[in-house]
């Protein structure tokens, strides 16, 4: 994901003296120009400021959706390495670390 940065009002004042006067005239109109809309935290298409998730939180969220809850498919690790007899230990559908720890 990409982190977008909002423009602060002080940042917009680094332009030349002729452009400051032009921005004041634009602000008096009823419609917001794309530059003015950006100051409010949105672009003209309506996209909001996106927050990047913390890696730790993302990892915890992924951990909750473990392969044990999926009934039809085993995890990617199991599909890649199909070793051993499938008939033995039928309760365990997956050989990933989480499932091995759960059933031992």
Swiss-Prot record:
<dbReference type="InterPro" id="IPR000492">
    <property type="entry name" value="PRM2"/>
</dbReference>
<protein>
    <recommendedName>
        <fullName>Protamine-2</fullName>
    </recommendedName>
</protein>
<feature type="modified residue" description="Phosphoserine">
    <location>
        <position position="8"/>
    </location>
</feature>
<keyword id="KW-0221">Differentiation</keyword>
<dbReference type="GO" id="GO:0000786">
    <property type="term" value="C:nucleosome"/>
</dbReference>
<keyword id="KW-0226">DNA condensation</keyword>
<dbReference type="GO" id="GO:0007286">
    <property type="term" value="P:spermatid development"/>
</dbReference>
<keyword id="KW-0744">Spermatogenesis</keyword>
<keyword id="KW-0544">Nucleosome core</keyword>
<keyword id="KW-0158">Chromosome</keyword>
<dbReference type="GO" id="GO:0003677">
    <property type="term" value="F:DNA binding"/>
</dbReference>
<feature type="modified residue" description="Phosphoserine">
    <location>
        <position position="33"/>
    </location>
</feature>
<feature type="region of interest" description="Disordered">
    <location>
        <begin position="1"/>
        <end position="91"/>
    </location>
</feature>
<comment type="similarity">
    <text>Belongs to the protamine P2 family.</text>
</comment>
<keyword id="KW-0217">Developmental protein</keyword>
<dbReference type="GO" id="GO:0046870">
    <property type="term" value="F:cadmium ion binding"/>
</dbReference>
<dbReference type="GO" id="GO:0001673">
    <property type="term" value="C:male germ cell nucleus"/>
</dbReference>
<comment type="function">
    <text>Protamines substitute for histones in the chromatin of sperm during the haploid phase of spermatogenesis. They compact sperm DNA into a highly condensed, stable and inactive complex.</text>
</comment>
<keyword id="KW-0539">Nucleus</keyword>
<dbReference type="GO" id="GO:0007283">
    <property type="term" value="P:spermatogenesis"/>
</dbReference>
<comment type="subunit">
    <text>Interacts with TDRP.</text>
</comment>
<dbReference type="Pfam" id="PF00841">
    <property type="entry name" value="Protamine_P2"/>
</dbReference>
<dbReference type="GO" id="GO:0005634">
    <property type="term" value="C:nucleus"/>
</dbReference>
<feature type="compositionally biased region" description="Basic and acidic residues">
    <location>
        <begin position="33"/>
        <end position="44"/>
    </location>
</feature>
<feature type="compositionally biased region" description="Basic residues">
    <location>
        <begin position="45"/>
        <end position="91"/>
    </location>
</feature>
<dbReference type="GO" id="GO:0008270">
    <property type="term" value="F:zinc ion binding"/>
</dbReference>
<dbReference type="GO" id="GO:0006997">
    <property type="term" value="P:nucleus organization"/>
</dbReference>
<dbReference type="GO" id="GO:0030261">
    <property type="term" value="P:chromosome condensation"/>
</dbReference>
<feature type="modified residue" description="Phosphoserine">
    <location>
        <position position="10"/>
    </location>
</feature>
<keyword id="KW-0238">DNA-binding</keyword>
<keyword id="KW-0597">Phosphoprotein</keyword>
């Amino acid at each position: 994901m990409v982190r977008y940065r909002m423009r602060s009002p002080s940042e917009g004042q680094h332009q030349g003296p002729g452009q400051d006067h032009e921005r004041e005239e634009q602000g008096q109109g009823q419609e917001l120009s794309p530059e003015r809309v950006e100051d409010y935290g949105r672009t003209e298409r309506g996209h909001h400021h996106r927050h990047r998730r913390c890696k730790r939180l993302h990892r915890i969220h992924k951990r909750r959706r473990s392969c044990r809850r999926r009934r039809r498919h085993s995890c990617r690790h199991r599909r890649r390495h199909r070793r051993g007899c499938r008939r033995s230990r039928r309760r365990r559908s997956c050989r990933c670390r989480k499932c091995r720890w759960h059933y031992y």
